[in-house]
Amino acid sequence: MNITRASLPMLNTTCSCRREKWNFLGRYEGTFDYWIGLHRASSKHPWMWTDNTEYNNMFVYHMNAQCLKKPEEGESSPGTGGVHSYKILQRNSLRAISPESSAKLYCCCGVIMVLTVAVVALSVALPATKTEQILINKTYAACPKNWIGVGNKCFYFSEYTSNWTFAQTFCMAQEAQLARFDNEKELNFLMRYKANFDSWIGLHRESSEHPWKWTDNTEYNNMIPIQGVETCAYLSGNGISSSRHYIPRIWICSKLNNYSLHCPTPVPV
């Protein structure tokens, strides 16, 4: 699943609205609005996904229509002829919006169809050596249920609070450790997904005179300075802070998501 920051027309963006994915998207999308793959020809037609399967209105059904945002003054209301697409809004809701002109959407679709035909025709016309590909299965070890995969790691965000020691014990029971980040991408994900909660991570030290270490005793590289003079670290709204170990907080676990990938081998015929 990819969440883009670029502002683009709703052409090929898709969303599988299973409940667990909705919970993830609703929490992770932050203050931005995102296109998803629902559209319809007019207000008299049913909502469809981009593969032309009909939308089952699961959120209107389960959420008692609370997932449709009340339109602001001057906006088109759901049910009017100008409404054509859904998009995700902040605070776990869906909202119907009106494009500037339906003609623009049809024009874009027409351009895409023309380009697609041109590409196919060109690929057929170009001489190419026939090859037979021997495909070797790709084997992935997916993250466990309720864990989120980022890069080569799986992360778990607790739903309740405890002290640093119990949090580490819990993670170890899951064959993991309190969260470790090795680059800014992972840190940015953790900071964003933890929302407004202070969260224990796997950095600790014996005293203010000792260096910070991860739970495997490798030394922290001070990528981001840690504030305070205490012995256990947590993610806060201001970055990384330190605290005494007995303060109750939610926590984050992490472990490697090991997988093997075998690329297909082309064999000329």
Swiss-Prot record:
Topology with respect to the bilayer: Single-pass type II membrane protein
N-terminal signal peptide: none
Glycan-carrying positions: 163
Subcellular location: Cell membrane
Tissue-specificity statement: Detected in vagina, eye, tongue, stomach and spleen.
The C-type lectin domain, residue ranges: 150-254
BP-aspect Gene Ontology terms: negative regulation of osteoclast differentiation
Extracellular compartment spans: 129-269
Residues spanning the membrane: 108-128
Main location as per UniProt: membrane
GO cellular component, one term: extracellular space
Side of membrane Cytoplasmic, spans: 1-107
S-S bonds: 171-253
MF terms (GO), sorted A to Z: carbohydrate binding; natural killer cell lectin-like receptor binding
Entry's induction text: Constitutively expressed in bone marrow cells. Up-regulated in vagina after 17-beta-estradiol treatment. Down-regulated after removal of ovaries.
Keyword line: Cell membrane, Disulfide bond, Glycoprotein, Lectin, Membrane, Receptor, Signal-anchor, Transmembrane, Transmembrane helix
Role summary: Inhibits osteoclast formation.
Protein's recorded name: C-type lectin domain family 2 member G
Species of provenance: Mus musculus
Name of the gene: Clec2g
